[in-house]
Amino acid sequence: MFLRNFFVFIVVLFHFFNCYSQEVKNDTVKVEGWQNSGKTTFLINQTAFSNWISGGENSVAATLSVDYNLNYYKNGWSWDTKMVGSFGVNKNSDSKFFKKIDDRIEVNSVMGKKFIDQFSFSSFLNFKTQFAKGFKYSTNEEGNETRIEKTRLFSPAYIQLGVGIYWKKNNSLWVNFAPVTGRLILASKKFTNDLNQGEEYFGIPRGQNSRFELGASISAFYKFDLVENVVLEQRVNLYSDYLYKADNVDLDYTLSAFMKINDYLSTTLVIQCLYDDNAIKKLQLREVFGLAFVIDILEIPRIL
């Protein structure tokens, strides 16, 4: 039942984007060879109170992110790579710890060979992990804040390899469907050796450092101008494991809105939704809003 619905969804999705491509004038001319683009964003938000009767906590948060794209096209062959790195922390006046609000390393690379119109046979690689240690925070009997390490660099790490069909309208709109996708989840035994019998760490059983899955995946990207000076970016990744609970689809969806003030300043909103029942059987939500300083990566040498 799930697989049938899964493939119906794919057909509807491709039909929608195909209709879109027919309705919108294609003003993108394919340039052969290499193209690159990217941006560096420094996002900050801050709250301060002094003798504020209603109460409140002083806080400051900052996030640095790099988003880089490398695209190649020649004789029907395409190779599109997106690399994202982001790290952010928050400090509240009532906490002795700096706490992460963002921590992400991700590389997504798709290679395709065109066979008709905007469709290509494809193979892809996706890698995801984080930069720094992640902690679970609590308060002990004395009322002091404590923390326990839960994650770190490469714990967990996700590697996906798959083959399928790649539909690409342009660099701002594409979908990749890979019905044959292998996924490897890696972690240090530091986090699995002390698990109780039957417990798992991101799906990895006690005493092990990896888990292999075989399933299907969908990844898509869409960037467009909502109104003048307001750009929206949507990224979605879906994965279903054929070997274990195929109806539990892992979701990673990110919506980014950039409201331009001038060439270097913008107001930025990021909303991310995650679901992975190997990690937690609940929908995870993250939202960040603030003032961002944005620099085009290609302009950095000129500025320096």
Q: Whereabouts are the PLM-identified features?
A:
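Residues that define the transmembrane beta-barrel architecture of outer-membrane proteins
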Residues: 58-64, 101-105, 155-159, 210-216, ...
